[in-house]
Amino acid sequence: MKASKIGLFLLLLLVAVGSPAQIITKLSQVRVQGNKFITAEGKTMVFRGLNASDPDRLEKSGHWDKAYFEEMKRWGATLVRFPVHPTAWRSRGKDQYLQLLDKGVAWATELGLYVVIDWHSIGNLKNEMYQNGMYETTQKESFEFWRTMAEHYKDNTTVAFFELFNEPTVMGGKLGTCSWDEWKKLMEETITIIRANGAKAIPLVAGFNWAYDLREVAQNPIKAEGIAYVSHPYPMKREKPWEDKWTADWGFVAKKYPLVLTEIGFCGPDDKGAHVPVISDESYGEAITRYCDTNGISYVVWVFDPQWAPMLFTDWSYTPTRQGRYFKKALQAYSAKN
């Protein structure tokens, strides 16, 4: 075969097969319809996910890699939450941190996992007072972070959710005051910035008491379309039996809006890292997963890490902890049915 014909043959073969950039999977855009998450094809999505630890921390320890995501996929996850601490964002710098996020988003895309980007602060954003130094931020920095995320990921369908602020709390007045109206205004301002910068990701809004309490939503919801709400109903937030209290505090929201429990989990009183409010046993796991299954609520388990608590595994061979054994089985069972 002449060289010119060989060249033409190779060119046609390349076009037929496609370049690597062309064959990377693009996930279906997720949007809000009523109280559900819907794909572009009209499929209802109820997510079962896992929390990564901070990508900055994982990269420093050599574990921010595709193998980490592959293991989450094996556990049955359909959603991965990236908790971005303000201190890590500042110390690494915007451009370098975006490179970390881009790698994670690319691995998630290849594996068919959707992503939540979470601004992982705890405290009172109105007063700019926080639970401890690692959560320190400002209103301006928070707005700028979301402008950056919106611009950067506006055309990326894998990044399905922006969790605007991890855990709002005034810590019983130790961090001053913040009314629901004041919090609502901050969240609505953030959503305006995100939307004006072209992002289609769904904003996730938490309530007070470390993101547990959504009772204010009943009479005074966030004034924005296409959003979802968040709760972190750890076991010690309420005494058993939990279910009726959950419904009164946050579960009622799922009748009208999509709801994502972006942190759930438990550990025994003598387990490594045991602390308030996560101490419990498998009865909590059974109750919270059953409640979510019954009510079509998405959840993300905290945390896929052997150091942060309550941890899901004990070592980098991914040996499950007590809660890890429970949730791995629950996620895999749900994945098998769906």
Model-derived segments and their meaning:
Residues 21-79, 208, 329-333:
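N-terminal carbohydrate-binding accessory modules
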Residues 29, 61, 133, 143-161, ...:
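Extracellular glycoside hydrolase catalytic/binding regions
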Residues 49-51, 81, 163, 204, ...:
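Residues embedded in well-ordered beta-strands within globular domains across many folds
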Residues 1-8:
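Bacterial N-terminal signal peptides that target proteins for export
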Residues 54-56, 86-90, 123-125, 168, ...:
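Feature marks short, surface-exposed loop/turn motifs that line or immediately flank catalytic pockets
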Residues 64-126, 141, 183-198, 277-296:
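Aromatic-lined substrate-binding rim segments of carbohydrate-active enzymes
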Residues 41, 45-66, 89-93, 130-134, ...:
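Acidic/histidine-rich helix-loop elements
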